[in-house]
Each structure stands twice: as C-alpha cells, then as structure tokens.
C-alpha cells in the first residue's frame, strides 16, 4: 500500500501518493466508482510496464502517451536504487477523476521502507515513493491534501537541475533538466 498504513509509526500521518495511485487514496475517486490507475512505480513493481530509460547525458525529446491509454513512462536513475518516474496523466478513462492532469513526477527510493512487511510509506521523511509536486507546496507529504491540480507539471514547466529542483536522498542535485515543451492528450 502506498498510503501511510501505520500513521502512528514512526512519525506523523501523511497521504503517500494520494489520489494519484489506486494503492493510496486513488481507490476512492468518484466514491470508489472510478478509481485511479496505479502509479508508474506500482506498475513497475507488478511488472506491468517496460519504462523508457533515457541517457540523461544526451539531449532528447520524448513524446509521452497518457498512461490511461497504454503510455509508457520515463524512468531515470538518480542514485543507486533511487529513481524519478515521469508519466503523462490525462483526464481520459480511469484518469478522469484525478485532481489534475499533466506530467506527474514520482521520486522512488528502494532503500526506504520494508516492502515485504508493507511498511514502505510509513515515514514522510523517508518515503519509498512520493510525488514531486510542481507547485512545491508538499501538501501530500504534509498531509494537507490527497492531491491537487498543482501537483503535475504543465506546458513550459521545468524540473530537475533547474526549475523545480530535484535532489536525491543523499543531498545531490540531479544533473539534468526536463522542460515540458507541449502538453496534449490527443
């Protein structure tokens, strides 16, 4: 489960991936009638996707199809066992009830938590996976919301080394920048 399954341990309550993943609060979208799809990290865990793994040393353009239409996410290793997942989330199909749409960025650190004991997202200071929120307010981490329209990145946004900066869990700024050059769900 990607919500805080044990909110009293070890720190405080938070909402994990919130409405962005069926394994968090996304199973309750539309009163449970239209749950969200799993996140890219969840789809990878169950072997349901084969992500694009770009070489960040090279410039490149990537056209992402919405995950709700069978699209494939990008996966970038930023440290040993730590990844950035980049996924297009649209308002189509099971994604229709999401709190927003655009480029959703997850940061996953496999060294945090205990997957076998279902203790992966128990501590917001050491999440197994979290959303890198475009608006920068960290509302999911703080337990202030279950996801918002400000979480995904949109046309013109940048993230990585510049724009919304991404640091690995060892305190190193990533060496690449991604710019959202266009955004369409067609």
Language-model features: where?
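Extracellular hydrolytic enzyme modules, especially secreted metalloproteases
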Residues: 1-98, 109-111
């Amino acid at each position: 489960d990607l919500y805080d399954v044990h909110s009293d341990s070890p720190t405080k309550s938070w909402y994990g991936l919130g409405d962005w993943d069926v394994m968090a609060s996304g199973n309750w979208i539309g009163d449970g009638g239209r749950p969200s799809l799993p996140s890219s990290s969840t789809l990878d865990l169950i072997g349901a996707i084969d992500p694009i793994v770009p070489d960040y040393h090279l410039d490149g353009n990537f056209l992402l199809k919405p995950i709700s239409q069978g699209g494939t996410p990008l996966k970038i290793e930023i440290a040993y066992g730590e990844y950035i997942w980049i996924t297009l989330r649209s308002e189509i199909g099971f994604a229709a009830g999401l709190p927003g749409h655009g480029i959703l960025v997850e940061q996953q650190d496999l060294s945090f938590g205990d997957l076998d004991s279902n203790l992966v997202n128990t501590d917001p200071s050491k999440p197994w996976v979290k959303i890198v929120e475009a608006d920068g307010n960290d509302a999911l981490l703080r337990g202030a919301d279950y996801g918002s329209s400000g979480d995904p990145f949109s046309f013109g946004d940048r993230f990585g080394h510049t724009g919304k900066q991404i640091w690995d869990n060892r305190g190193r700024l990533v060496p690449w920048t991604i710019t959202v050059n266009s955004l369409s769900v067609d």
